[in-house]
């Protein structure tokens, strides 16, 4: 410094970890997979980010996991796809059994975006009301297509038993298309909060049945598209759609 020799060099360097972002197709489960668990694939995605579209082909089997998907870095124009390798939801079952607790969430998506879930069976079982899919904070561009999204029996009006819950933050471009949504206190519960909205929510060609309170409760939504859905209410205490 100041044209003099530096006799103390330990503070002259920095270090960090650099990893290449994910891109391309990866396998989960089965023989010689890229990832043995779905949770492992998500952890790598969160750590590395995605520099292009990523497809996680999930091989046939039952995966007993609880999935937490937080904010992830995904390149502009790219998406991350979780799908059955055979494109048959009966072949890939992601499940979790709950017997205690009041805020159980098998798949929790927090402040995340650009996700696709295709042709999967997502299922909770057990003796307490639980959610299969729970989105909160700001979530955008997330689609569930061709999935069986199956809650447990929940004879309660509690929102903690909603099969799918979108709450506590703005939601943009969330799509549910051609899914089977079953049981729970609500099939779908959307309530972003007093200061937020769900924008451009799409519900198309879904079969929603056996929810205890409402097939779909839709609150504070701008630009809603509800087309060709079938809602079956099994008791006189349950209703179809509430807005």
What is each residue range found by the language model?
Residues 24, 52-54, 65, 72, ...:
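The right-handed parallel beta-helix/beta-solenoid scaffold, focusing on the short coil/turn
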Residues 113-124, 140-153, 170-185, 197-214, ...:
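Right-handed parallel beta-helix
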Residues 57, 68, 81-83, 93-95, ...:
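Extracellular beta-strand solenoid repeats
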Residues 70, 96-108, 127-136, 155-168, ...:
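Extracellular beta-strand/beta-solenoid scaffold signature
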Residues 1-22:
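Extracellular/luminal regions of secreted and cell-surface proteins that mediate adhesion/ECM remodeling
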Residues 74-130, 151-159:
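Right-handed parallel beta-helix/beta-spiral solenoid domain characteristic of secreted/periplasmic
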């Amino acid at each position: 410094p100041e044209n003099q020799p530096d006799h103390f060099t330990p503070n002259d360097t920095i270090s960090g970890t650099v990893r290449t972002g994910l891109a391309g197709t990866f396998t989960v489960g089965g023989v010689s997979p890229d990832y043995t668990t779905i949770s492992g694939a998500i952890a790598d995605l969160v750590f590395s980010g995605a520099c292009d579209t990523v497809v996680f082909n999930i091989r046939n089997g039952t995966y007993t996991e609880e999935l937490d998907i937080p904010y992830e870095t995904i390149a502009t124009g790219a998406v991350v796809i979780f799908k059955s390798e055979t494109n048959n939801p009966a072949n890939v079952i992601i499940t979790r059994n709950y017997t205690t607790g009041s805020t159980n969430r098998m798949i929790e998506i927090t402040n995340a975006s650009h996700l696709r879930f295709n042709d999967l069976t997502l299922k909770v079982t057990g003796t307490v009301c639980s959610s299969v899919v729970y989105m909160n904070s700001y979530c955008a561009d997330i689609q569930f297509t061709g999935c069986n999204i199956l809650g447990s029996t929940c004879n309660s009006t509690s929102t903690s038993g909603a099969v799918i819950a979108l709450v506590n933050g703005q939601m943009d471009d969330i799509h549910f298309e051609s899914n089977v949504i079953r049981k729970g206190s609500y099939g779908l519960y959307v309530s972003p909060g007093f200061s937020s909205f769900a924008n451009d929510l799409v519900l198309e060609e879904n079969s929603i049945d056996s929810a205890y309170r409402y097939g779909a409760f839709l609150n504070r939504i701008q630009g809603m598209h509800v087309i060709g859905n079938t809602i079956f209410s099994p008791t006189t205490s349950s209703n179809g759609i509430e807005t």
